[in-house]
Amino acid sequence: ESYYISKYKIKIDEISIKRLNLGLDDIKSRSRDLNQLAEMSLFYCSKFPLTISKKAQKYIKKVDKTIFKDLLLVLGNTENDFKKQKIEEIMSKFLIEKGLKLSDIIQYIRAMITGLDVSPRIYDIMEILGFKEIKKRIESFING
């Protein structure tokens, strides 16, 4: 555990372990090697501030704060039922109302939530992290 604290500035607690267990199968299927698996797992354990990859920083610099503030308001209505299927339904409706496609905003969401430009499926990540954590991570970029 001290290795992770010194190298990555994270402390693996029970919440981190729970999140890792829920997301590990998806991460394993997307990882080419053990190093990539470890890197793609860090966002489940990270506290603020998130470590942002150079590629993800490009997306974060271009974030349209208004869209993501509106998205958080809409997602907040599902806080007590923050499951993948419900998140997909809400996002789909939101995107239609805004005249957008998922591909228009997915990389921005991924960058703000994970600090990465590549990750497991975003709806799975959102469910595992939960609304409060998602809100904290997105707000740190749109307010900061």
Question: Could you say what each language-model-derived stretch is?
Answer:
Residues 1-98:
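Small-residue-rich helix-loop
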Residues 82-144:
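Charged substrate- and nucleic-acid-binding regions of tRNA-handling and nucleotidyl-transfer enzymes
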